[in-house]
A protein has these predicted regions:
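Bacterial Sec-dependent N-terminal signal peptides
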Residues: 1-27
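Lipid interaction determinants
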Residues: 20-159, 172-220
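Phosphoinositide-binding peripheral membrane targeting modules
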Residues: 162
Length: 220
């Protein structure tokens, strides 16, 4: 009887630990041969990006939903910036001892967001979120990354990321990598933000200096 009780307690502990592990949102980093690898994770999605700090060169990014077994993330990719060369749509990533947790303070807007619309010249234009072409922003523990991609064709249209904070209605991001233009690395951009009816209204100027008003909705 005691043995069975111990076994039940151990099994419950394993289940509880697994649930806690799956519910974590963290940002990790490790370096290899001068290349920074950053991993942003929430309870069901993972994005890994590689870039060089010394030259500001973006190398690649992959991302998608995952199932976790032990220290291994089995991923079904939604995007792969190197897909034309390697055709990889599924991958297993192992969390290793050299992964350093670099998570910062959790800010407002934490989570995955899909762009659902824009406002141009006072006119609001909406997107169908079910279409394969998507623009997603992933905000976890003080870090952000946006990605434009097509889930059907694996066409990759661009990505950028870095650190962000939210304070007094301002969303402020510092760019640490940018696939389209390395010269934008180091820029700090400030936007007004407001969440209205669960939609994030994002207003300001783009990295090119153009006015923008984007509307984003949370992705599960």
């Amino acid at each position: 009887m005691k043995y069975k009780m111990k076994k039940i307690i151990i099994n419950l502990t394993i289940i509880i630990f697994t649930v806690i592990t799956y519910s974590q949102s963290d940002v990790y980093s490790y370096s290899e041969n001068g290349i920074i690898n950053r991993i942003i994770i929430d309870n069901n999605y993972l994005v890994m990006t590689s870039y060089k700090v010394d030259s500001n060169k973006f190398i690649k990014t992959i991302g998608g939903f995952y199932n976790k077994v032990g220290n291994r993330f089995n991923m079904s990719l939604e995007f792969n910036s190197n897909f034309k060369n390697d055709s990889i749509s599924k991958i297993e990533i192992e969390k290793k001892a050299n992964w350093k947790n670099i998570s910062l303070k959790k800010n407002d807007l934490q989570g995955k967001w899909l762009m659902v619309g824009r406002v141009r010249n006072g006119n609001e234009q909406r997107r169908n979120l079910n279409r394969p072409r998507k623009t997603m922003k992933f905000l976890i523990n003080g870090y952000f990354q946006w990605i434009a991609f097509n889930t059907e064709t694996f066409q990759f249209s661009g990505s950028g990321g870095g650190k962000y904070i939210t304070e007094n209605g301002k969303y402020i991001e510092n760019i640490e990598y940018f696939s389209r233009d390395d010269s934008k690395v180091g820029l700090t951009l400030e936007f007004d933000y407001d969440v209205i009816n669960r939609e994030w209204n994002h207003k300001g100027f783009s990295s090119q200096g153009d006015p923008l008003h984007e509307i984003w909705v949370k992705r599960k």
